[in-house]
Amino acid sequence: MKSIPSLACYLAEAATRWPHAPALRTQEQQWTYREWLAKVATVADVIEPSLHPLIVSGSSLDLARYAFACSSRNRPFQPVDRNGLPIPASPLPPGVALVITTSGSEGEPRGVMLSDANLDAAAAASNRHLPLLPGDLWLDCLPLHHIGGLSILWRCTRAGAAVLLHEGFDAQALAVSLAQHRVTHLSLVPAMLAHLLDTGIRPPVSLRHVLVGGAALAPSLFDRAIDAGWPLNPSYGMSETAAQVATHTAADGPWHAGLVGRPLGANELTLAADGRIRIRGPQIMAGYVGGGGVAADGWLTTGDLGEIDAKGRLTVTGRADDMLISGGRNVHPLTVESCLAGCPGIRDVAVTGVPDPVWGDLVVALVVGNAPPASIDDWCRTRLPGAARPRRIVHLASLPRNATGKLEREALRRLAREAKP
């Protein structure tokens, strides 16, 4: 039986094939593949093989080192947020390479168990879909305790490309890196993209792909970015699928809100009877720490709603548990948010509901910006059905988001309840 390559296998092969090629760099340091292999070896020497995950917090560089080192010692790796709660280590089933803690934006965080096979399938599919070649450079400013940031290590090392690590997102620091280095790939969440556009940063000619995910991308933001020359690839994925499982490219035709294209690689997509997105394929996790997560037939039923057209293209329409019932009609916050994002004077927006004796769920828009309520209402009257129009507007200095840019829905509901009518 053919063995499944691990992150450590990628590194060993790359150090043999491209020993002097850049492997990883920060804003201050850089390592070739041969140098990075030696650096990882010094960390691996003090790691004992075990079925208990090695739980590590620290800088992005720390997490990158330990990801490779744990792989070389066949030890499950579990990166965690430096500001998060301590997580007890427990023995895992054989074959688990990585444990990623979900964001918890929709409930309690859970540990997602991923195998080398999951991670290899995800890296291979991504590298084919958004071609990643030896000598390319992927700028990674996402947190490495989340799958979106960490998976870039697998993709680049598998391809013989290099990773440019940033310690979090800073628009000016990112602008400097884009000017100084031949960056070909970049991963962002929509809030980061909006900040780049607001500061007037332009994309370099070397940039081929900007992977955008982690939260809904508003059409107005997409249009602004495309007009400014940013080569966007809206994507869909999660910890449970080892990152992106569908990503829009020009081959999928014109983009519209929520469109993420066809499934990558050998993954399959379908919809449950209630409209939830179901996924099956080699990227699907082994399960959650403590059990559960994947049906016996291999299908993962997500908490996301979607539509699949005749060409097999997926459009994500929102979270199933965010659905509001306003005036007897189903209203999804994402639909209203996409509309409001284009309203002049609104820089950021989220929509939720509060209980109401007349409407059932009263639609509440939480807005960052200077658009007055009357202007917002006028904007919505010609663009949204009556049941979906916000009946209450709450102005905020900022919206509650987690480290990956996802809206914290429970915090939004609390803010809406606490706001004065």
What are these model-derived regions, one by one?
Residues 281, 305-388, 398, 405, ...:
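AMP-binding/adenylate-forming catalytic core of the ANL superfamily
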Residues 120-137, 145-185, 199:
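Conserved AMP-binding/adenylation subdomain of ANL enzymes
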Residues 2-3, 7, 12, 20-48, ...:
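Conserved AMP-binding/adenylate-forming core of the ANL superfamily
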Residues 3, 29, 44-81, 141, ...:
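Conserved AMP-binding/adenylate-forming
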Residues 185-188, 196-255, 268:
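Gly/Ser/Thr-rich phosphate-binding loop
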Residues 32-34, 97-124:
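Conserved AMP-binding A3 loop
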Residues 259-266, 272-298, 319, 331:
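Conserved ATP/PPi-binding loop(s) of AMP-dependent carboxylate-activating enzymes
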Residues 2-8, 20, 87-101, 108, ...:
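Conserved pre-ATP/AMP-binding loop-to-beta segment of ANL
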